[in-house]
Amino acid sequence: MIATYRFNATLTARPGMGDQLVDLLLTGLDEGSPGASEYCVVYLVSRSASDPDVVHVTEGWTSEEDHHRIFAGEAAQAIVARIGGLLAGESEYTDYVPVRGKADF
């Protein structure tokens, strides 16, 4: 499948809570979670090289509609609800349409 919709979030954890935030975000790959959906073709959790409490999440979806539908579900909302308590402030969100590139993990 091809990702026609991408989503990126930059989240800053409370000091020293970056590991917990990463662990929570990685549960998004568990069976029944958003990243395990057939419509999610990219789910990448990364950290800032200079600040371990800054975490980036990049997602690629088959469509914007699929992204919104899956994230409206119970599993996604449970993760989102738990994230709030780990954050130092507001997160940055960006959505975009891929043009071309490569991901080889």
Task: State what each model feature region is.
Residues M1-Y5, V42-D53, I79-F105:
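Glycine-rich beta-strand-turn "strand-cap" elements at beta-sheet edges
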Residues I2, G18-Q20, G32:
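A broadly tuned "polar low-complexity/structure-edge" signature
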Residues Y5-L11, V42-F71:
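Short, well-ordered beta-strand segments in beta-rich or mixed alpha/beta enzyme
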Residues T12-L25:
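Short, surface-exposed ligand-recognition loops at beta-strand->loop->(often short) alpha-helix junctions
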Residues R14-G16, T62-E64, R100:
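Short coil/turn motifs at secondary-structure junctions
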Residues T27-V41, G60-T94:
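An amphipathic, aromatic/His-enriched active-site/gating alpha helix that lines ligand/cofactor pockets
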